[in-house]
Amino acid sequence: MSFTNLYQEIREEWKSLKKSEIYDVEKSRMIGWRHGPSVVRLDHPTRIDRARALGYKSKDGFIVVRSRVRRGGSNREKIMGGRRPRRLAYNKLTRKKSLKLIAEERAADKYPNLEVLNSYYVGEDGLYKYYEVILVDKSHPNIYNDPHISWISEPQNTGRVYRGLTSAGYKVRGLRTGRKGSSKSRPSIRANGRLRR
């Protein structure tokens, strides 16, 4: 069996996870993940097909971490000052960032010398969602000498996850769609508002 066929089979298993044979294994894994640390470095990706598709290579300079994020909307600290009840909102607030982007940022906080390349979903339970984040050491010789990934070593890509330059960041900023219907998303939501003043 070729690697292409193997990756395709893995991908098909993950598409219908609850019906597949690996579902029981995945459930037992998540019990351990739930009680462990929120950001954990892994020896190898859980979903090798997805990791390879997003640019991961099994060589020095690449690492994979699993990041855990609480599901649902966000809460903010309860407001103690007086105001109209409708202005008191402190729970059931919709996040402006996706859970995937939050997971990437937390992984970048844990490893400040690495850059986030991409991330992918690996599971969820009643309380958390789990993502695996691919991180790259941009100062490693394997990285800056590799023509496919050396672009991440350039200075303009420093801290890319915090500036919404990863795939999850682009989606949150509304830059996945074409020009029609998303005219207020470019050059950015904030800059567009300033231009229209």
From Swiss-Prot:
InterPro entries: Rbsml_eL15_core_dom_sf, Ribosomal_eL15, Ribosomal_eL15_arc, Ribosomal_eL15_CS, Ribosomal_uL23/eL15/eS24_sf. Residues 175-197 are annotated as: Disordered. GO terms for biological process: cytoplasmic translation. It comes from the Archaea. One of its GO terms (cellular component) is cytosolic large ribosomal subunit. GO terms for molecular function: RNA binding; structural constituent of ribosome. Keywords: Ribonucleoprotein, Ribosomal protein. Pfam families: Ribosomal_L15e. Belongs to the eukaryotic ribosomal protein eL15 family. This is Large ribosomal subunit protein eL15. It comes from Thermoplasma volcanium (strain ATCC 51530 / DSM 4299 / JCM 9571 / NBRC 15438 / GSS1). The gene is rpl15e.
